[in-house]
Amino acid sequence: MLTLKIAVYIVVAFFIALFVFGFLSSDPTRNPGRKDFE
């Protein structure tokens, strides 16, 4: 049960990070200060 919970947390964190990174990369005009971040 603990392994399943850890796996779920890893998948959720991975999708959240992927969504945030993709959102920032595809919309640099909303965050002009983060252009040098990519």
From Swiss-Prot:
UniProt-annotated location(s): Cellular thylakoid membrane
Keyword Zinc-finger: no
Signal peptide from the UniProt entry: none
One Gene Ontology cellular component: plasma membrane-derived thylakoid membrane
InterPro entries recorded: PSII_PsbI, PSII_PsbI_sf
Transmembrane parts of this sequence: 6-26
Functional description taken from the UniProt entry: One of the components of the core complex of photosystem II (PSII), required for its stability and/or assembly. PSII is a light-driven water:plastoquinone oxidoreductase that uses light energy to abstract electrons from H(2)O, generating O(2) and a proton gradient subsequently used for ATP formation. It consists of a core antenna complex that captures photons, and an electron transfer chain that converts photonic excitation into a charge separation.
Annotated protein name in UniProt: Photosystem II reaction center protein I
Native species: Gloeothece citriformis (strain PCC 7424) (Cyanothece sp. (strain PCC 7424))
